[in-house]
Amino acid sequence: MPRYRLLVEYDGTPFNGWQRQDKGLSVQGILEKAVEKLCGVPCTLHAAGRTDAGVHATGQVAHVDLPRDYPADTVRDALNYHMKPKPVAVVAAELVDEDFHARFSAVGRAYLYRIVNRRAPLALDQHRAWWVPVALDAEAMAEGARRLLGHHDFSTFRASECQAKSPMKTLDVLDVTRVGEEIRIVAEARSFLHHQVRNMVGTLKLVGEGKWSPDDMAKVLEARDRTKGGPTAPAAGLVLTGVSYSASGGKSGPTG
């Protein structure tokens, strides 16, 4: 069966996450229904990352095996037609080797977290950013973020329901920059623990508020205890921006 790789973009606001569920709307469920309308038989999609409820994506990657060959552009256009008016789009589709796997072939994932730091509430971006009205020191947050880089036990930033076999991860990038009233946090790693990015952001906010020092980030990391970390940042500010593959597998998204 021919295998297709899909580059998928979605607004996570109305969804209960990527993963198909018995009840509730899911991105996977919407895509699989569209695939079935295209080819007439049920097909299972596999994604690079199973994003949580409310988390968005501009660079999600999925693959699906179809019962016959279709032009890649036909796959893209047909799926987009059948998904209307849901806020999901297949940006690109391509035929790939049968050994490609959206999840297991990935060598890197990139996320962007947006904080809007101003007194006025958000009228347009309330579902696409975390509104923080208290002044934040982005430079202190950036310094604290550097304490987390490298290979560590990230238990402090791991959700209690995380199913990963090990809390050991290598964090390659955790950059914090301010652009006007917006603070952008970019995180890149081969893979992340459940809620890892949002838990790191929630903890960095404490540094930005001056409640913690940048050195406190190293201390809570060493504690390996979720109760020692900061709160989980809201899902709305998080975007999966890209997934990286080996040279033969290519990459997705602007930061993939």
UniProtKB/Swiss-Prot annotation:
GO terms for biological process: tRNA pseudouridine synthesis. The keyword Chloroplast does not apply. Substrate binds at residue 111. Gene3D superfamilies: Pseudouridine synthase I, catalytic domain, C-terminal subdomain, Pseudouridine synthase I, catalytic domain, N-terminal subdomain. It is an enzyme of class 5 (isomerase). Its EC number is 5.4.99.12. GO terms for molecular function: RNA binding; tRNA pseudouridine(38-40) synthase activity. The active site is at residue 52. The keyword Lipid metabolism does not apply. It catalyses: uridine(38/39/40) in tRNA = pseudouridine(38/39/40) in tRNA. It comes from the Bacteria. Keywords: Isomerase, tRNA processing. Belongs to the tRNA pseudouridine synthase TruA family. Formation of pseudouridine at positions 38, 39 and 40 in the anticodon stem and loop of transfer RNAs. PANTHER family: PSEUDOURIDYLATE SYNTHASE, TRNA PSEUDOURIDINE SYNTHASE-LIKE 1. Homodimer. This is tRNA pseudouridine synthase A. It comes from Paramagnetospirillum magneticum (strain ATCC 700264 / AMB-1) (Magnetospirillum magneticum).
